From Swiss-Prot:
Record field: compositional bias (Polar residues): 533-544
InterPro entries the record matches: FAM47
Pfam short name (any one): FAM47
Protein name, as recorded: Putative protein FAM47C
Native source species: Homo sapiens (Human)
Region Disordered: start-end pairs: 1-21, 159-797
Length: 1035
């Protein structure tokens, strides 16, 4: 079987077979024509045409192919070019080109013309101006050094000879000729500062607006227009501070240049410096000159201050500096002049605008008057001038603008824009002058103090009309009362304002109008009320007097003004909070309702009313800040300052007490909650209404009622109701809680003592809530604590208001002993019993079998799974599991189940004789899942696939010659025991040996006698097994 004849085998390629490309027909493109030429002309060399010299020259047009010679392969062995006619010399031919020939190698006429034009322009520039390549040379170096540089660069002195530079040294106001300096190299400017000219104005014209407009610098530009003087340039000189100073320097000018000179503060100061005094004054000096508003607009610095300084006074700050405290003081001190409006205008910068415009009076300089604090005061001192109403008009700033509108006097707008501090201080301190004092406080405390001081000055109504900004307004008050105005402007903090009233004067409502800022607006309208200066109190007593009247701002205004009442201030302690203090003063003054409505600031407004009326309701409405307003004012109780705390919390404290009780500051400390604490302490007065309304703000409104009423409801309730009702606020706002308590309840945070004692600071510190409790211990008064929750906190240590959008009123129990935490616990425990019962029923039903539930009769008989299983003894040993029931493999069976079978002796011999063969044949089947893919090949690409052999791609190819010479495969009978035994049988019988046995022995080289049965190998194995058996038996 293994024999294969050579003729049967295929022949290898390369011997007798032709290449494969010869067998393949050519492409149709190369198909031959009838005359044995290929169709594709470019490839067929028989169609090539050889032309004579000059035929490829198309400069004179296309030549006729008359002289062309067509050469074909069948006609010539080599291409022959026959030149008919005389041949000219190549050099002479080039010279014979006609003019009409197109010269494509030369430049076009436009190119040389353009080049000549460029060269001419460069020549003109260099001849006219040697420094054309250095346009900034005149600006970058001083005149002296410039002259030295021009000597080598301009030897011919073409630059106006030395007169241009000498004139520059003599006067910087003389401009150079425009023709001499086309590029503006030499600008006659001082080497260090950019000068802005201030145009003067006629003598009887009001001073034009002072409007600084540098976009990136804190330099404010003052543009006064005095009649006969030239205003000097503006010089910026703030070396270390971003403070811009405006300093007019001409000797006889009304408004001189704005000079920036911040000495120690980052506050921009406006200094007007008359020649005779070292004090900077901001005042038009002509008697009949009106001063327009001063507008500063440094975008990057929010600290604009207009400061008119006396010789020994500190610089006044018109802008609240600290980012966290926005306390600005405006202190006008004219003897008989009313304060004009202070109008803030810069949207992004705290630029204050001061525009004095008295027609017949000279505006006195603004003076700083810091008595005990480092507060600068701006004191205008125009004599015999009435102050028109202050009208703020800032569109988007929380700046308090006071806008005067008197017929003869106009004061420039003063605008402060503290970004994150909403406390502004206005202090009027002239003896007989109605002035506004803007005084910034320390940066860490946003306490604003307003102290009215003029005794005999009448001030017209202050009207606020800022559409989008909360502008604080001042209200005129009686001559002997210091009516102060506190305007907080921090967007994140709720500032409360306190406004004292005259003893017997009825004050009209205060009406704020800011839409987007929590700026308080004071709009007083009494005919015979004098507006006292806004003065910052000493640092020890953080008492601020405020008279807020904004209807839309959440600023709380208190207006007590008793003629003989002492004022005490509640001073909160948090350092980083802009807190305003409210000081009640009227002993017999009735406070009218004050509805604050600041959209973004929790500023509460208290509006006092007729003198004999008790404290009426106070209604704050800030939408986003949790500022609470409390206004209880018994007839003979003193009002204490209301101070909001840290900027993040709009917490305001208002604590009225009996006439002889001094209450110290109440410092709440909720870090991020707008919790306001209100502690009324009149001897017989209960807590008045507390009404939280804004859906998104934790602003609570307190409506105090007459002194004989107990606690009234949060939403309007009867005045005799003893229990105060708490209206749940929205879930995202901190709701203030009003909880009246007896005089001896347990006080969590504040515990005011009896009369004639000063209440010390009690700091509420609930662990997880920012709600503090103020519990006064007066003999009979009801103490109510106003608690505002954090905007997103539901758990309040004392009281918790949850449902924001529900109209129901949940009353808080006024029991003295229990706190709000216990109430919450009780509320939780009320629903606990029913809830637990429901849970137990559901659990019991869940664990009941479905089948048993289907048979209700079985359940009625008390039959369940446990009763049935108890009837049978189920032990863990008999418990059926999945492990016992599943089918097992043979290797998983126990050893006891396994058994073995032994072979007999003959079978062992046979088995061992074939042992080696079995080892080679029996192999584990490869795992098809884990087998890796192997790329196979079938030989070289140029070989026929039939001639190739299947091989791995990474194995070397097999030579075809070796395939032809491969050895014969071994016969299957070679290694078998059967053929040998059959041979022995044939020999024993004498039969003819079959051919297959003959070929086997011939192939193996065996002889019939050499190989016999039994096979020698098998015999040796059998003998070995017998020896081992005998030895084992002997042992």
């Amino acid at each position: 079987m293994g024999d294969q004849r050579p003729q049967d085998r295929p022949s290898s390629p390369g011997m007798d077979s032709t290449p494969w490309y010869c067998d393949k027909p050519p492409s149709k493109y190369f198909a031959k024509r009838k005359h044995r030429r290929l169709r594709f002309p470019p490839v067929d060399t028989q169609n090539w045409v050889f032309v004579t010299e000059g035929m490829d020259d198309f400069r004179y047009g296309c030549q006729s192919p008359e002289d062309t010679l067509v050469c074909r392969r069948d006609e010539f062995l080599l291409p022959k070019i026959s030149l008919r006619g005389p041949q000219a010399d190549p050099k002479s031919r080039k010279k014979k080109l006609l003019k009409k020939a197109a010269l494509f190698s030369k430049l076009s006429p436009a190119q040389p013309a353009r080049k000549a034009f460029v060269e001419e322009v460069e020549a003109q520039l260099m001849t006219k101006h040697p420094l054309a390549m250095y346009p900034n040379l005149g600006e970058d170096m001083p005149p002296d050094l410039l002259l030295q540089v021009l000597k080598p660069l301009d030897p011919e002195r073409k630059l106006e000879d030395a007169g241009s530079c000498e004139g520059q040294e003599k006067t910087t106001d003389e401009p150079t000729e425009p023709g001499k300096y086309p590029c503006g190299e030499f600008s006659p400017r001082p080497p260090e500062t950019r000068v802005s000219c201030l145009p003067p104005e006629p003598p009887k014209t009001p001073v034009s607006s002072l409007r600084p407009e540098p976009p990136e610098t804190g330099v404010s530009h003052l543009r006064p227009q005095p009649p006969k003087t030239q205003v000097s340039s503006l010089h910026l000189e703030p070396p270390e501070t971003g403070v811009s100073h405006l300093r007019p320097e001409p000797p006889k000018t009304q408004v001189s240049s704005l000079h920036l000179e911040p000495p120690e503060t980052g506050v921009s100061h406006l200094y007007l410096e008359p020649p005779g005094t070292g004090v900077s004054h901001l005042c038009p000096e002509p008697p009949k000159t009106r001063v327009s508003h001063l507008h500063r607009e440094p975008p990057e610095t929010g600290v604009p201050d207009l400061c008119l300084e006396p010789p020994k006074s500190r610089v006044s700050h018109l802008r609240p500096e600290p980012s966290e405290t926005g306390v600005s003081h405006l202190h006008p001190e004219p003897p008989k002049t009313l304060v004009s409006s202070l109008h803030p205008e810069p949207p992004e910068t705290g630029v204050s605008h001061l525009c004095p415009e008295p027609p017949e009076t000279r505006v006195s300089p603004l003076r700083q008057l810091p008595p005990e604090a480092g507060v600068s005061h701006l004191c205008p001192e125009p004599p015999k001038t009435r102050v028109p109403p202050l009208r703020p008009e800032t569109p988007k700033n929380g700046v308090s603008p006071l806008f005067p509108e008197p017929p003869k006097t106009r004061i420039s707008n003063l605008r402060s824009e503290p970004p994150k501090i909403g406390v502004s201080h206005l202090c009027l301190e002239p003896p007989k002058t109605r002035g506004s004092h803007l005084r910034p406080e320390p940066p860490e405390t946003g306490v604003s103090h307003l102290r009215p001081e003029p005794p005999k000055t009448r001030v017209s109504s202050l009207h606020l009309e800022p559409p989008e900004t909360g502008v604080s307004h001042l209200c005129p008050e009686p001559p002997e009362k210091d009516v102060s105005h506190l305007r907080p402007e921090p967007p994140d903090t709720g500032v409360s304002h306190l406004c004292p009233e005259p003893p017997k004067t009825r004050v009209s409502h205060l009406r704020p109008e800011p839409s987007e800022t929590g700026v308080s607006h004071l709009r007083p309208e009494p005919p015979k009320i004098l507006v006292s200066s806004l003065h910052q109190a000493p640092p020890e007593s953080s008492v601020s007097h405020l008279r807020p009247e904004p209807p839309e701002t959440g600023v709380s205004h208190l207006r007590p003004e008793p003629p003989k009442t002492r004022m005490y201030s509640l001073r909160p302690e948090p350092p980083d909070t802009g807190v305003s203090h409210l000081c009640p003063e009227p002993p017999k003054t009735r406070v009218s309702s004050l509805p604050p409505e600041p959209p973004e600031t929790g500023v509460s407004h208290l509006c006092p009313e007729p003198p004999e009326t008790r404290v009426s309701h106070l209604r704050p409405e800030p939408p986003e800040t949790g500022v609470s307003h409390l206004r209880p004012e018994p007839p003979k109780t003193r009002m204490y300052s209301l101070r909001p705390e840290p900027p993040n919390t709009g917490v305001s404290h208002l604590c009225p007490e009996p006439p002889k009780t001094r209450v110290s500051s109440l410092p709440p400390e909720p870090p991020e909650t707008g919790v306001s604490h209100l502690c009324p302490e009149p001897p017989e007065t209960r807590v008045s209404h507390l009404r939280p309304e804004p859906p998104e703000t934790g602003v609570s409104r307190l409506h105090p009622e007459p002194p004989k009423t107990r606690v009234s409801s949060l939403h309007a309730e009867p005045p005799e109701s003893r229990v105060s009702h708490l209206c749940p606020e929205p879930p995202e706002t901190g709701v203030s809680h009003l909880r009246p308590e007896p005089p001896k309840p347990r006080v969590s945070s504040l515990r005011p003592e009896p009369l004639e004692t000063r209440v010390s600071h009690l700091r509420p510190e609930p662990p997880e809530t920012g709600v503090s409790h103020l519990h006064p211990e007066l003999p009979k008064p009801r103490v109510s604590s106003l608690h505002l929750e954090p905007p997103k906190t539901r758990r309040v240590s004392s009281l918790r208001l949850e449902p924001p959008k529900t109209g129901r009123v949940s009353s808080l129990c006024p029991e003295p002993t229990k706190t709000g935490a216990s109430h919450l616990k009780e509320l939780f425990q009320e629903g606990t019993s029913s809830t637990m019962e429901c849970v137990s029923d559901s659990l019991q039903r869940r664990h009941t079998s479905r089948k048993l539930r289907d048979f209700k009769w079985a359940g009625d008989l008390g039959v369940n799974e446990e009763s049935i299983s108890s009837l049978f003894d189920f032990t863990p040993e008999c418990r059926a599991t999945y492990q016992d029931q599943k089918n097992k493999k043979a290797n998983e069976c126990s050893s006891g189940l396994k058994y073995s079978m032994e072979l007999d002796e003959m079978d062992e011999v046979k088995f061992f004789s074939q042992e080696k063969d079995l080892d080679g044949k029996i192999q584990n089947a490869p795992n098809s899942h884990s087998a890796q893919h192997v790329k196979m090949g079938y030989g070289a690409w140029y070989l026929k696939p039939k001639l190739g052999k299947k091989l791995r791609s990474d194995e070397p190819l097999i030579d075809p010659k070796l395939v032809l010479e491969k050895p014969d495969e071994p016969d299957i009978l070679d290694g078998l025991y059967g053929p040998i035994a059959f041979k022995d049988f044939i020999l024993s019988k004498g039969y003819e040996m079959p051919g297959i046995i003959q070929r086997l022995f011939a192939r193996r080289g065996w002889t019939y006698d050499s190989v016999k049965t039994p096979i020698q190998r098998a015999m040796q194995v059998y003998k070995y097994k017998e020896d081992v058996t005998d030895a084992s038996e002997e042992d």
